[in-house]
Amino acid sequence: MEEKLAVSLQEALQEGDTRALREVLEEIHPQDLLALWDELKGEHRYVVLTLLPKAKAAEVLSHLSPEEQAEYLKTLPPWRLREILEELSLDDLADALQAVRKEDPAYFQRLKDLLDPRTRAEVEALARYEEDEAGGLMTPEYVAVREGMTVEEVLRFLRRAAPDAETIYYIYVVDEKGRLKGVLSLRDLIVADPRTRVAEIMNPKVVYVRTDTDQEEVARLMADYDFTVLPVVDEEGRLVGIVTVDDVLDVLEAEATEDIHKLGAVDVPDLVYSEAGPVALWLARVRWLVILILTGMVTSSILQGFESVLEAVTALAFYVPVLLGTGGNTGNQSATLIIRALATRDLDLRDWRRVFLKEMGVGLLLGLTLSFLLVGKVYWDGHPLLLPVVGVSLVLIVFFANLVGAMLPFLLRRLGVDPALVSNPLVATLSDVTGLLIYLSVARLLLEAV
């Protein structure tokens, strides 16, 4: 947003200048206002939503968090509520009402009463679907025609239907029972002879999803096919809605956030850091940290078991951090590559043997390369007795950690656990435990032979 416009908005709010504020709000783009939203005081946000042109107010509201949506829908005056609800697209309206329903079921019913009967029925139909499925993402505001219509008839129909449709770039063809039969683009219509029938120019090979298709699969299909719109059908193949690219972008952001949380063993996928308190953050992180520290306690037992070796050659302790850190980093690299390959379907569970053999070679090459560097450091430190110990240990640690990182995602997927949730933290912990065991075992074996 232009700095001048942002300053004007803040000044108008501070001074309570309603006329100046209306002028700024007429000019401002909803996305620019959203970028400034967190900087506005609570009472100023309320004023902005009250005075914004209704289309812009609906756009801003649709991009707020569910908690904020519920808050404003419960506090705005009835006349303003009605205006905003009428402007929201059906899918955004359903999402906003669901946010209120979770907070206050009684008020949710009052909001529904503000809707006309047709809109209320459509919103209730959308509310039956899970939020993370295609049915929860779709909007029923699509354009569908019959295959027996001519191009001229379709164009006349589009002129009437376009104002209420989410998009008219793609027109879907259905039979008399509403079952999806084909698709054609607006371009197809424009270049076709007006007397041509839809059945002659439509594409009968339609890529679609069902109402219960997971949102991540919906996003993947749209990305793979470069679609801006994807039709949604019910269990009988009847067209019930469309998913548009703007909804998929929100899904991709949510899925990316969820995956990043999982990689760090934070198992609250919808966590918003700026809105979470200390207790919520503690609950999101503590469970896996407890599990991992209990696993990591094995390392103290290993150290106690090799106490005599460490006492005999105290310099062994100097290289524990770099050995374990290198093993953990190697395992995490390997796990990240495999998790991503599984997520993008570059690999599936049947590929584990091929991956195992490939990563054996990769692990050996990495181990030899890194061992060469660390052995040089050991020599420089003046510990020639430890050269074979550190060199052999690092090769084995890296080799083993690389295999663990590559195979663990396959094992977790086989067990029905999301690999992204525990792979990296678990790989790091297992690498520490096994790395320490390898290092001290090699030390005992080689030093006793000297």
UniProtKB/Swiss-Prot annotation:
The gene is mgtE. It is found in: Cell inner membrane. ATP binds at residues 170, 185, 187-188, 207. Changing residue 325 to A: Loss of channel activity. This is Magnesium transporter MgtE. Mg(2+) 7 binds at residues 428, 432. PANTHER family: MAGNESIUM TRANSPORTER MGTE (PTHR43773:SF1). Belongs to the SLC41A transporter family. Highly selective magnesium channel that plays an important role in Mg(2+) homeostasis. Functions as a Mg(2+)-dependent gating channel. Exhibits low activity with cobalt, suggesting that it might also be involved in the uptake of Co(2+) as a micronutrient. Also exhibits low activity with Ca(2+), but it shows almost no activity with Mn(2+). It comes from Thermus thermophilus (strain ATCC 27634 / DSM 579 / HB8).
